[in-house]
């Protein structure tokens, strides 16, 4: 009888051990992001500070180009991406398996102008530099900022200007004004450009109770369904990085410096002030507004709703930074 019980016990232990090992998910997560600026800093911080390793997640990470990040997520090559919200919404409406799961920095951009520009009215008929068309920043400009100051997109000549060239384009008169993301707006101001609209005034909050959020973390639903534990840990590592940026700015600035050694440290610190870190989720009013603007511009293949393009369920239970210590693996 003892031998029988011992055999049963040994078999049960073997079954439990195999089951436990089978429960461990060793899938290598494919993650893509743009360049290591404030909008996409979270995965670079997670890699540099070892957040993913502390959560026990193996990540194949590439970064460096936001256009490539958008493209790779649009064709399903990667599980997780740091993308423009407008792109994520547009891809979702086109049937791509992308959903917004978290937010990044807020505002983090300036409107700058040639010193000869005295008022917004002076911009009528002039060239106005933008990063690209139909992203969240472009739509904020044409649907929110220009109308607030008595202009429309037809009143200015919108021109694509590479953000690193903003200062020279402004000061040489190639464009009268521009709307670059940070730190290039602050750099232009340092070089003599006029600050026409500060970061915290991107949105008139008397009429729209939100900030401008351009980028965030996006996941494929298929990945979330097939690897829920890994998806949650990737999400929490992102949330940890946002909390570091909010609570410990010097640590966040050090990460920016590490990946951008040629950028003046004072510029990095100055531009940090123009980026908000209050959001782990993009507000419903903001996503609804982006969808409304995109419908007006005719760039959605079908109607979509906030609930269809967002899923914040992975954020549930987040214990705060550092998540890996408070929850364990």
Task: Identify the role of each PLM range.
Residues 225-301:
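Secondary-structure end/capping motifs
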Residues 100-119, 210-221, 225:
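Hydrophobic/proline-rich hinge and linker segments of small-molecule sensing/allosteric domains
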Residues 25-49, 62, 110, 120-190, ...:
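Bilobed "Venus flytrap"/periplasmic-binding protein-like clamshell domains
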Residues 20-31, 53-56, 116-127, 226, ...:
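Immediate post-signal peptide segment of exported/extracytoplasmic ligand-binding proteins
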Residues 57-58, 74-83, 95-98, 126-129, ...:
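Alpha-to-beta junction loops
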Residues 7-16:
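Bacterial N-terminal signal peptides
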Residues 295-329:
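Conserved C-terminal helix/tail region of periplasmic/extracytoplasmic solute-binding proteins
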Residues 86-87, 165-169, 175-257:
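Pocket-lining segment of extracytoplasmic ligand-binding domains
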